[in-house]
A protein has these predicted regions:
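STAS-typified acidic loop motif
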Residues: 3-35, 52
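Short leucine-rich amphipathic alpha-helices used at interfaces
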Residues: 6-7, 40-41, 116
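Short acidic-hydrophobic, aromatic-tinged amphipathic segments that line or gate anion-handling sites
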Residues: 103-107
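Amphipathic alpha-helical interaction surfaces in cytosolic regulatory modules
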Residues: 26-102
Length: 117
Protein backbone atom coordinates (compact mmCIF):
# COMPACT_ATOMS: atom_id res chain seq x y z
CA UNK A 1 0.00 0.00 0.00
CA UNK A 2 1.36 3.40 -0.99
CA UNK A 3 2.01 5.91 1.77
CA UNK A 4 0.25 9.24 1.33
CA UNK A 5 2.30 12.12 0.01
CA UNK A 6 1.07 15.27 -1.66
CA UNK A 7 3.29 17.72 -3.50
CA UNK A 8 1.79 20.95 -4.77
CA UNK A 9 3.75 23.18 -7.10
CA UNK A 10 3.23 26.88 -7.34
CA UNK A 11 5.23 29.63 -9.00
CA UNK A 12 6.05 33.00 -7.57
CA UNK A 13 8.31 35.52 -9.31
CA UNK A 14 9.81 32.79 -11.49
CA UNK A 15 10.52 30.54 -8.51
CA UNK A 16 9.19 26.97 -8.43
CA UNK A 17 7.87 26.24 -4.94
CA UNK A 18 7.11 22.61 -4.11
CA UNK A 19 5.00 22.15 -0.98
CA UNK A 20 5.27 18.68 0.56
CA UNK A 21 2.66 17.12 2.84
CA UNK A 22 2.72 13.57 4.20
CA UNK A 23 5.52 11.01 4.20
CA UNK A 24 8.15 10.11 1.59
CA UNK A 25 9.18 6.47 1.64
CA UNK A 26 9.94 3.48 -0.57
CA UNK A 27 6.31 3.22 -1.71
CA UNK A 28 6.10 6.70 -3.22
CA UNK A 29 9.55 8.30 -3.63
CA UNK A 30 10.21 7.25 -7.24
CA UNK A 31 6.80 8.37 -8.47
CA UNK A 32 6.87 11.61 -6.48
CA UNK A 33 10.30 12.72 -7.64
CA UNK A 34 9.69 11.62 -11.25
CA UNK A 35 6.79 14.09 -11.25
CA UNK A 36 9.02 16.82 -9.80
CA UNK A 37 11.72 16.25 -12.45
CA UNK A 38 9.02 16.46 -15.12
CA UNK A 39 7.57 19.67 -13.70
CA UNK A 40 10.99 21.32 -13.47
CA UNK A 41 11.96 20.25 -16.99
CA UNK A 42 15.14 22.00 -18.06
CA UNK A 43 17.18 22.85 -14.97
CA UNK A 44 18.92 25.82 -16.64
CA UNK A 45 18.83 28.86 -14.34
CA UNK A 46 15.94 27.37 -12.40
CA UNK A 47 15.07 28.52 -8.90
CA UNK A 48 13.49 25.97 -6.57
CA UNK A 49 12.21 25.97 -3.02
CA UNK A 50 11.25 22.73 -1.28
CA UNK A 51 8.74 23.78 1.39
CA UNK A 52 8.82 20.82 3.79
CA UNK A 53 6.36 22.22 6.33
CA UNK A 54 3.94 19.30 5.97
CA UNK A 55 6.54 16.56 5.51
CA UNK A 56 6.62 14.25 8.51
CA UNK A 57 9.06 11.55 7.31
CA UNK A 58 11.55 10.92 4.53
CA UNK A 59 13.71 7.92 3.78
CA UNK A 60 17.24 7.68 2.38
CA UNK A 61 16.03 7.36 -1.21
CA UNK A 62 14.12 10.64 -0.84
CA UNK A 63 17.24 12.31 0.53
CA UNK A 64 19.18 11.04 -2.50
CA UNK A 65 16.57 12.53 -4.84
CA UNK A 66 16.72 15.89 -3.06
CA UNK A 67 20.53 15.89 -3.34
CA UNK A 68 20.32 14.90 -7.02
CA UNK A 69 17.87 17.68 -7.81
CA UNK A 70 20.15 20.17 -6.04
CA UNK A 71 23.10 18.86 -8.07
CA UNK A 72 21.17 19.34 -11.33
CA UNK A 73 20.11 22.83 -10.29
CA UNK A 74 23.64 23.84 -9.31
CA UNK A 75 25.23 22.37 -12.47
CA UNK A 76 22.85 24.46 -14.58
CA UNK A 77 23.43 27.80 -12.82
CA UNK A 78 20.25 27.62 -10.76
CA UNK A 79 19.58 27.96 -7.04
CA UNK A 80 17.67 25.84 -4.56
CA UNK A 81 16.55 26.25 -0.96
CA UNK A 82 14.86 24.05 1.60
CA UNK A 83 12.43 25.73 4.00
CA UNK A 84 9.96 25.05 6.82
CA UNK A 85 11.40 21.74 8.01
CA UNK A 86 9.53 19.79 10.67
CA UNK A 87 11.92 19.19 13.61
CA UNK A 88 12.19 15.44 12.91
CA UNK A 89 12.85 15.97 9.20
CA UNK A 90 15.34 18.75 9.96
CA UNK A 91 17.21 16.45 12.37
CA UNK A 92 17.51 13.78 9.66
CA UNK A 93 18.68 16.28 7.04
CA UNK A 94 21.26 17.69 9.47
CA UNK A 95 22.43 14.20 10.44
CA UNK A 96 23.17 13.24 6.84
CA UNK A 97 24.73 16.63 6.05
CA UNK A 98 22.21 17.89 3.50
CA UNK A 99 21.83 21.19 5.37
CA UNK A 100 25.55 21.87 4.87
CA UNK A 101 25.12 21.47 1.11
CA UNK A 102 21.66 22.86 0.36
CA UNK A 103 20.81 26.25 1.86
CA UNK A 104 18.09 25.78 4.48
CA UNK A 105 15.97 28.57 5.93
CA UNK A 106 13.02 28.80 8.30
CA UNK A 107 10.40 30.21 5.93
CA UNK A 108 9.48 30.30 2.26
CA UNK A 109 9.60 34.09 2.45
CA UNK A 110 13.25 33.96 3.52
CA UNK A 111 14.05 31.60 0.65
CA UNK A 112 12.28 33.86 -1.85
CA UNK A 113 14.20 36.89 -0.57
CA UNK A 114 17.50 35.01 -0.93
CA UNK A 115 16.63 33.81 -4.44
CA UNK A 116 15.76 37.35 -5.53
CA UNK A 117 19.01 38.84 -4.22
Amino acid sequence: METLIEVNKKEQDGINIFEFSGELDETNADKTFAAIYEQVGDFTNTKIIFDLKGLKYLNSKSIWYIADIFSNVEENDGKMYISNCDEGVKDVLELVGITTIIPTVDTVEEAIAELKS
